Each structure stands twice: as structure tokens, then as C-alpha cells.
């Protein structure tokens, strides 16, 4: 019996795959537990439509990520921070991914999720710093920060 997997099933198939499985296994396990549905011509057509829509959505997300990268790669795109500095040259507060994301939105109107900004630890130094940001699995950019003394 041909089925379309609705979820990943270890050793049998991944979500969206069409595979031939034993009839009893399909009816008694996969279909009952909503892990798969019977592959009729109508359900195969629905699956192809969903896959095309998903590909189109992924292409739009990739294009948006590339547009954000183009803005971040410009020399004039430098996020300005003014922080109070102690006698040892370190800032009193620290600059976190959340703060960087908010300032980027405020200064340039570019929205970047704070979870995409790759910071090993919060920034506490002054000067020019480049922070990597993973916009998409295929697109990585750098945010330029200019941290000055207030």
C-alpha cells in the first residue's frame, strides 16, 4: 500500500515522502496514529501543491535574508552605542544580542531576530567591533558596532 508520511517515522520514511509499505502496517499503525495517510491521486496532488508553496516560501525567506545582508554589508551601516566606561576601560553595562537587535531596528529599520546574532558573551569593550549574524542557513553577515564612551 502506498502512503504519504505526515511525520518522520524512524526507519520507514520522512515527512512528505511517498512510500510503499505493508498494508497491515499502514492501516493498523501508520494511519491510526496519524503518521501517514493513503496515497490517492488527490492526496498526492495536495502534497505536490504544499511542496511548491513551501519552496516558494523558502525562496522568499532567502531573498529577504539576502536583502538584509546587503544592507548590513554597506559601510555606512554601523550601529552606534554610547556607554558609560569605568576606569579599566570596560563598559558598566554590557551589550547583548537583544540590545544590538533593538538598536539595529531603531537606527536603520532592519529587523534581525536576537537569536540569529552570534555572540559568545556580551560585549563590554569600546571601539569598533564586528558581530556575525546568521540570517538564513545559507546567508551569514556581519553587524558593525561602533561603541563610544558617553
Swiss-Prot record:
PROSITE patterns, A to Z: RIBOSOMAL_L9
Gene3D superfamilies assigned: Ribosomal protein L9, C-terminal domain, Ribosomal protein L9, N-terminal domain
InterPro entries recorded: Ribosomal_bL9, Ribosomal_bL9/RNase_H1_N, Ribosomal_bL9_bac/chp, Ribosomal_bL9_C, Ribosomal_bL9_C_sf, Ribosomal_bL9_N, Ribosomal_bL9_N_sf
Gene Ontology CC entries for this record: ribonucleoprotein complex; ribosome
GO biological process assignments: translation
Keywords: Ribonucleoprotein, Ribosomal protein, RNA-binding, rRNA-binding
Gene Ontology MF annotations: rRNA binding; structural constituent of ribosome
Family annotation (Pfam families): Ribosomal_L9_C (PF03948), Ribosomal_L9_N (PF01281)
Stated family: Belongs to the bacterial ribosomal protein bL9 family.
Function: Binds to the 23S rRNA.
Protein's name in the database: Large ribosomal subunit protein bL9
Native source species: Streptococcus pyogenes serotype M6 (strain ATCC BAA-946 / MGAS10394)
Amino acid at each position: 500500500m502506498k502512503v504519504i508520511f505526515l511525520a518522520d517515522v524512524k526507519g520507514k520514511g520522512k515527512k512528505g515522502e511517498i512510500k510503499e509499505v505493508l498494508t497491515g502496517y499502514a492501516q493498523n499503525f501508520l494511519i491510526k496514529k496519524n503518521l501517514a495517510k493513503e496515497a490517492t491521486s488527490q492526496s498526492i496532488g495536495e502534497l505536490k501543491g504544499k511542496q511548491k508553496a513551501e519552496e516558494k516560501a523558502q525562496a522568499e525567506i532567502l531573498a529577504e535574508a539576502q536583502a538584509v545582508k546587503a544592507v548590513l554589508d554597506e559601510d555606512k551601516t554601523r550601529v552606534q552605542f554610547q556607554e558609560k566606561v569605568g576606569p579599566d576601560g570596560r563598559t558598566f553595562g554590557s551589550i547583548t544580542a537583544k540590545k544590538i537587535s533593538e538598536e539595529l531596528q531603531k537606527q536603520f529599520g532592519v529587523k534581525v531576530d536576537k537569536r540569529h546574532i552570534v555572540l559568545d558573551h556580551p560585549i563590554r569593550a569600546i571601539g569598533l567591533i564586528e558581530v556575525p549574524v546568521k540570517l538564513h542557513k545559507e546567508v551569514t553577515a556581519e553587524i558593525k558596532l561602533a561603541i563610544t564612551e558617553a
